[in-house]
Amino acid sequence: MSTLIPTASACYSLQLPPTEKDDRLNLNVRTGSASTLYNSLIFVHGGLTIGLELLNYTIPELNEIFYNRINISASKYKTVEKYLSGELFYLSLIERNWSRVVLEELEIRPKPRLLHQICAFNNCLYLFGGLALSQENDEDPTLVPCNDLWEFDLVLKKWTLLDDGSNYELDDAVPSPRFNHKLTVISSLSFANRKDHFGLFIAGGKDKQSNEIYDNSIFDLVEKRYVGSQPFRLVATTGDDTKDKETGLNEFVSNPEHFLNVDQTRNAILSITDDADTPNRKQNKNPSNHHESIVVYGPTRQTGDCQNSLVSFKVGKREIKGGKVLRLHKNSRVAKLKQSIIPYNLRYPTAGLFGQNVVLTGFLPDEYEISIFVYNRPTGKWSRLNIFCSHEYGSHRFWGGFAWQSHHKVILIGNSMTSRTTSSVRFFSIMLTVSLPITNILVSSELSKGRSNNRTSSFVSHGEQRHHRNKSQNDSLLKAELSLESTTEDSTDSSSDKTAESVLDAPVPLANSRRQSFSSLGSDKSPTAVSFSDYVHYAAPKTTYTTIRSVFPPEAITLGRNAFNRIGDLIADIELVSCNGDRIPVSSAVLMERWGQHFISLLAKGYINAVDKFETDQALGLDENQRLRSKSSNSESSSSDIPKLKLSLSESLLSSSSGEHDKKEKMGLSSAHKPQKDVPQFRLPFQDSSESVNREEGSDCSKDRKTGGSSVSTAIDPHHVMPRKNSTSSFQSNSSSLLTSHLQDIPPQLPLPDEQIPAVPAAPVSYRSASRKNSQDHSSPRSSLIHTLTVLRNIPVSKSPRESPFSSPRPSMSGPSGGSADLFSSPFPSLKANYGKPPSNLRKKSYDMNDGTIESSLDSFSSGKSSMAKVSSVPGENPDSDESSIGFQEFNKNPISMFDNALLNFDNIDSENFRMEPSLIPRKLYIPFMTLTVKAFCEYLYTGQIGNKWLLAPTLMDNLLISKFYRVPLLYDLISEILFGVIGKKEAYIIGEARKLKARYFKLLRGANIPIDSNYEFPMDEYDGFLDTVDDGYLDITLLKKASKIHADSVAMSLKKKSVTSNNSRNASIRKEGSTTAESVLEEGEKQEEIVSKDDEDESRTGSTSEEDEVDKEYGLVYLEAKDKSLPTIGPRSKSIFDRQGLAAIEKLEEEQNDHQVHSIVEGEDHENLITLDELVASDAPSDYAIDLIFETATLVTDMKMLLRTSNLKAMTAKFRKCKADIEKEMADIEYQLTQMPSGSRNLAMKSANQLKESQLQSKSSPIIPTVSTVTPSPLPSISGVPSPRLPQQQLPEAQLPKLTKSTSSLSRIASHTSFKALRSMTDVTPMEKSTSDKSFRGKLQQTMLSRTPTNRNEDQDSSSASSIKSSSKKRGIFGLLTGLKR
């Protein structure tokens, strides 16, 4: 049996809710519970609190098993009532803990029940049906089906009864009481004349006699009533038995009327919506094509034919149409393999969506292990996912799975301490995450026969396309926050006000808090007023080169792009520093929410290192009165002893954050003087403008406070060195709270001038100097004094008008910052002090800092010296001194004296209310990549998508490295999907061209009456079925063997070249002769000499024989060269706003940039190197340059699947080009000989040719030297960039030949030592050194080469692999190719 491809799986233990005395309030085990996934939460409701193994799911069976279990147990409760729960629990997939929703005792709620269904939509849970206790006989209640429909508002935490179902006997639209049914959401009720409404589809189930129900009902969630005059049925027939047999509809289990029953234990159901924009239609008639279908997975009879197990029912304008089996990709070569992959008759199946894929989980017949299958709708291909866990095989037992769209994973829930039980018994203590595969969405034209995206529809233009949205969706369009968990489960519920978890904690509803945002952007009187919905789809058009659309809704993308491009400087409080020295300001809230756990760990380490260094400096003998005052002492002391804080009005505030600050604790502030407008102020992150105004106004009340002239804050002057004056310097009034005793000797600066500074002109963007070297700007970080403050990110700047883009990114403040870091009021690690150990040994409680190995370059996001984060929390006397030189054991720290201040006391701290000291928070993070790459990474963090203008190198490739090494899995999946699509398009192109070439060749042979051997195989036939099995989830052993064989052949060839000796002068002359005669036909002897010269040339460039040198040569990592001269310059806005230039310098810089861009366009320099993403995916045949880039990057990130695909593609490309050149040469020879022969002698020639062919086939063991035609045929036009068939391929220098793939052993070796070695430049391995081109041209090309480009070879000159260089140099006769290839 084939092996499944290993997947990125992870197993986690889950924390159960607190144990209660009543077992119905616990979540230990459940039977018949209902569950669903919404956003990043899994909800579980109801069920029995004991595990029962049910087989047929009938009421008599349930009662029998239950009472048998109770009678043999020692429980004192003997009735169902004591075991039937009605509680609602939810699992946070981020925090990995279960919680119970606590309601008031008197609030209405559904009755406890089991075998019911729940689903989630638009911040609400919906519950229907199930088995509940009857109320007719209170003495002996029994389980009966019910048909009541409930809604649970996640905002209000309140249950609402939508319909009690009492009139189902009078109204056919009301569903009858049922259990064991299914429930799903329909986004449009167009068949019921309510296309703008959405509703619930209640399917199947069993009645009170446990008989199957074939009636289905639909509930309108807008009008809150059932629709239709009669039940809806799922009809699995076309009316023609013959057609049903052909399509496979007769295979589905149904009743005699061909109605399908949907059962919880055998079926899965989901709705799929496809929106196709139609720009040519009038907007007032039909804004979009809204295609919705109900897809049902059901049991089949399996008569032997390979049919799909999914049937689709299209929701039409007037009715739900008959079923249609989803097409299945068929191929005669892999028919048996495909039949083994298709999941038939799964038990307890659940279905979900991921892009264009249907994710199906369930249990195969006679198996207790859960399985995961993925069906790709455009291609019709099934694949199976491998479920891997580091624990012992079979130690876990999972009962069900959910598709977690926003994180591209499948979630499995179960237990590790159970026996072999079915999904009827459910436990909740273990969670396993399985990464969903990234398939070739761009190769759909090859597999789906034209049903996929084509080249012209790769992008939706910024035109008049609109998305159709209903009223209810419009109500929640703008409820998208920056949090990643706001992504939703399906495309119709694309934006929620909060994550479901935060919604559950909200005390008041927020459903319509931002509905007014739908007002027109223009004036009410303007005839061209544009709604926000129209603007959203203009600013964030939907792209078709990626199917992962659930990361963020268009509204969040639009708001994020505006925040990044327009007000990114104003809301930023951290800077990302590139290897070019440029600084990109970014908000730490965005980094924490979008980057996630890895950044939080880095920030925690950096903060703890800063605190530890401060603690160390204090313990080394600093005076007691020079220590930082604690926040508690500041708040408890009187105003006469310690002055209060002083805040000033700041224009850099983000008004949209006011809602967040309303929930946070306010600070009581007072001030001695209202700050002057031109006095630089310190800034703290995320202070609300309204709060600043109130504080500023409130500060007037404290002007007359009696401070004896000592009105300086301890955070500004903790040592009470000098009183503050009204017009003091920026240093005196804005010192950091970390200034220690060695700063008190710095003399004060002179007062600022009394005259008012003119307002800063409102320029369109913010600028800083292009180079920070020798900068004498007063705000430059190179200044000797301000450099001390720059490392703390407290750079004083003057206040600017509100309209100015130069306004401060954070509110200004002078005074102690205790308790004011509202940004970091979220739960943060509770840490204990470090005694005698380096800061790196600190661990945090709330977050697992050991979750994977953090790269050494990232561990230093701290105050210490590092290559990743150059942050210094306390200015030292020797900035170059190492922290490790401090002897931690040379002094004894006094715990009592050290923890008398709240900053350093981490004991007994409430993580919910913990606030970090702003002056100790690291403010710069160095990322060792180029500015374009870092800026693109920030763009992804703000928008959640990949920009179509990203350069392939270095931007896209470097971001793949960032996502791998710095753990950004969503970005890795987005890039991988695009790269696999590019690989797939190239594969499909080559296979398509090979088929065309084969058809032309065979047509010519038939026209010339040349017989074709029935056993003959075309050279490219081995790849014909490759795309049929490439994404089936199984490991391609043939591909691994092929890669290993190619690597072995490559190494053998290189060793053979080393043993060849030659004369270097003779080599040079022959190379020169070969380069000057590249356009003429060489004689046979000249070709042989050229081959020898190439061997000698390779030998002269082979220095070391070590294995690592071989690897370095095989993997020419030229793409890591740090040469960025030809990269397009970034706008000044991408640089920090704290180093500024005059307007004249700004205009000059813009002119230089424009001139450079115009010159680049005119000259056409580096056009291939500057290929963008939209150009890459729009091409039918991506260049070999792009494939080489993907191959090298896959090597660095050790993505085995991508690496094998690219290596196979490179070998496929080389073989196809060699085959095409030889075949076209043979075709030219045949055509010429046919034209030169007289008509009477053709038959004789054909007879001789047949005899020659037979003699060649009989002597397979002996080598046959191909014959050479002595007559030169007429020249033929070159096809698809391939050289003329008469042009010898042997003239190409070997440096331009495509490199061969490597074996897995060498790849593993590279993975062990190349990850960080690759971050240095590899200038000695550039393939241009092997080129025979002119030296001046080569030097110019190297100067303008991208910093991360592998090769700059012309793909039209690429030839066959190294193993076939000599064989390709020999001319073949008419039938020589056939004989040689068959052998």
Curated annotation (Swiss-Prot):
GO terms for cellular component: cytosol. Kelch repeats lie at residues 124-179, 199-246, 356-402. Residues 631-644, 726-758, 803-815, 858-874, 1251-1280 have a biased composition (Low complexity). Keywords: Cytoplasm, Kelch repeat, Meiosis, Repeat, Sporulation, Virulence. Pfam families: Kelch_4. Residues 450-460, 1341-1352 have a biased composition (Polar residues). Residues 693-707, 1084-1094 have a biased composition (Basic and acidic residues). Residues 450-506, 625-644, 653-825, 858-884, 1063-1114, 1251-1289, 1321-1369 are annotated as: Disordered. Negatively regulates early sporulation-specific genes. TOR signaling pathway component that contributes to morphogenesis as a regulator of this key morphogenetic pathway. Required for growth and hyphal formation at pH 9, for full virulence in a mouse model of systemic infection and for biofilm formation. Involved in chlamydospore formation, distinctive morphological feature of the fungal pathogen C.albicans that can be induced to form in oxygen-limited environments and has been reported in clinical specimens. This is Negative regulator of sporulation MDS3. It comes from Candida albicans (strain SC5314 / ATCC MYA-2876).
